[in-house]
Structure formats: structure tokens, C-alpha cells
């Protein structure tokens, strides 16, 4: 049974490597957030750049230190994501920044969360090779996210944010690759 679990982990790890490599490039992200239950919407557009991070690189070593992982533990791969976002309805700059992702086993380590600047972890899995599902929990909230690669030029994302079992917000995204 132990070897089966190792095999499953190896499959997940090879899938996350491939998923991050296929996501490399510049993307235009259009998204809409729905606040529940009142339905208030917010429309955003972001320019996103994704860079693949190889095992052992400085960024992944720093990420492992932030998460207090043993020095003998190496994240298998990762991605650096930078963004610049604009509120479409208000026609003003909303945010810009970057975040690091690093994978080990079925855990995705991040240097910050969606709603916190503190390091967070997410459980991840692949229902199929082109769809990455994440579940992150912190500050009493649960973030469930699905990222789906559609061919080589498009991605869709959906995020559901819940607290105490009640859904608070849904984010839906369509992302178009600009440069690979």
C-alpha cells in the first residue's frame, strides 16, 4: 500500500510540474466577483505574468524557509506570478504585486494568500491533467479554486470563498494568453 501512495504522489507531482510549465507566459485576465447573497458585482482586468521555478532555485528555497521546512526538503517546482489589476467599472488601478507558489506532495505552498500577506498552504489535486483544484483555509475562511487550461491560449478559473459553511463570494475568470 505504501508504494501505491508514493505512485499517486509522483503522478500529482508530475502533473503540477506540467501544469505550471504550460501556464508560463503573459495572460490577460478578465474576471467578475459576485458578492453573496446580495449579488453585488465587481469587474476586474489584470495583466498576469507566470514564470516557472525549477527545484532548488533561490525563490523556492526562500519559500521553503518562510514555511519553516527542513533544509533537507526541496519543493519540486513552483511558479512566480506577477500581476497588475484594474477595476473595470471604476476605471482605476486596483492592485499590483507578485506571489510565489511551490509544490511538494499534494501541498502547494504560497508566500501569501488571497486575503492575507502571510504564508499559506493549499491542498491540491487534478481531476484531469488540465484541471488544477485547490483548497486553502485560513482566518476562518475556505477558498476553493479550479484552474482549467483550455488548449494553449486560454484558462478559466473559478474561486468560491466561504466562511462557517456559507458561501460569501464567487470569482469567475477567463484568461487569454498574450505571450508564451
Curated annotation (Swiss-Prot):
**A Pfam family matched by this chain, by name?**
CpeS
Q: Which GO terms describe its molecular function?
A: lyase activity
Alphabetically sorted, this entry's keywords are:
Lyase
Q: Does the record carry Transferase as a key word? A: no
Q: What induces it?
A: Induced by nitrogen starvation.
Instruction: Check the record and name the InterPro entries matching this protein.
Output: Calycin, CpcS/CpeS
EC? Answer: 4.-.-.-
Protein family per UniProt: Belongs to the CpcS/CpeS biliprotein lyase family.
Biological role stated in the UniProt entry: Covalently attaches a chromophore to Cys residue(s) of phycobiliproteins (Potential). In vitro does not act as a chromophore lyase for ApcA1, ApcA2, ApcB, ApcD, ApcF, CpcB or PecB, the lyase activity is therefore unsure.
What's the protein called, per UniProt?
Putative phycocyanobilin lyase CpcS 2
Q: Which organism is it from?
A: Nostoc sp. (strain PCC 7120 / SAG 25.82 / UTEX 2576)
Q: What is the lineage of its organism?
A: Bacteria, Bacillati, Cyanobacteriota, Cyanophyceae, Nostocales
